[in-house]
Amino acid sequence: MRWFLIIALSTSAWAQTAPFAPPEDISFRRANIISEGTRMSAEVFAPKASADKRLSTILMAHGWGGTAALLRPDAIAFARAGYLAVTFDYRGWGDSDSRVILTAPEPREHPNGRFTAEVQEVREVVDPMDEVTDWFNAIAWLQAEPQFDPARLGLWGSSFSGGLVVYVAEHDSRVKAIHSQVGAMDGRAMIANETERRKTYEEATKMARGELGYPAPGVKVIGNLRGAPVRSKFVPYDPVEDVNKAPQCAMQFVIAEKEELFDNRDHALKAYQRFTGAKNLVVIPNITHYGIYLEAHRQAQKLAIEWFDKYLKP
């Protein structure tokens, strides 16, 4: 099986905190989402003309090595189309806080449940099970947003997050539609052969015995992808196998005809063929994986809006 992992859109640290001025017709604010006790950075976009209305909502997050700041053009387009659009950075990515681990055993006594400790950050590593947890917590956060319409929630995902949104829809019936573009949907490449299997399970054993820590932040071990995988966390991650756990969700899959990072037949094509609910498949001709962000970007954006309009608009 060919390695399936995805695009790491390059961005520097300063770009994530650079001032952002939204268009005049768009309401914009930054927000914080708490995921398993850690603060995640979010951005909220809405049409100013609909300030007093509940809106169909599109929740968005980045793929492997990206940040929420890169999603602003799409979020603005969705807001202009009448949606509440919310983007967020996973824990340990972009402007979100890092997860932390103790570097020494917890003290035996700590009044009021508090103690001072030295910790180490877990940052810019890729763990699909952690990331779907962040999606679930972002959905929980949305429930109290004044403009959020709880009956009309859609998810947008691209590349690695194109698989994450499928997984989330399979496990949360509040998701009514997804748009998944150039999505990778099966983590079992980590155990695809005996060499990969041994590497994955040896890493897990060493981590469990304290002989190996998390990868360093942002390290590149797979091509130019920023962020090393926590290999064992990919083994149970196979949303392509369970698409029919989301009968309530309309699923659109957009793929690149000349996809070079993985075999579409093992990912979106397989998911589309298996899914028995409302679905659509679009093959964009003559583009590679990265073309979805370049020459086919506007086409993909238009396809997403049309799909969400069909299944989320009143």
Feature annotation, model-predicted:
Residues 106-146:
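Alpha/beta-hydrolase active-site loop
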Residues 285-290, 294-314:
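Catalytic active-site module of serine/aspartate enzymes centered on a nucleophile-bearing elbow/loop
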Residues 78-99, 104-115:
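Conserved alpha/beta-hydrolase
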Residues 219-287, 299-303:
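Serine-hydrolase catalytic core
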Residues 64-76, 90, 266:
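The serine-hydrolase catalytic nucleophile loop
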Residues 130, 136-207, 234:
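Primarily recognizes the serine-hydrolase "nucleophile elbow" in alpha/beta-hydrolase
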Residues 55, 60-66:
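Active-site glycine-rich loops that stabilize anionic/oxyanionic intermediates
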Residues 17-53:
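N-terminal cap/lid segment of alpha/beta-hydrolase-fold proteins
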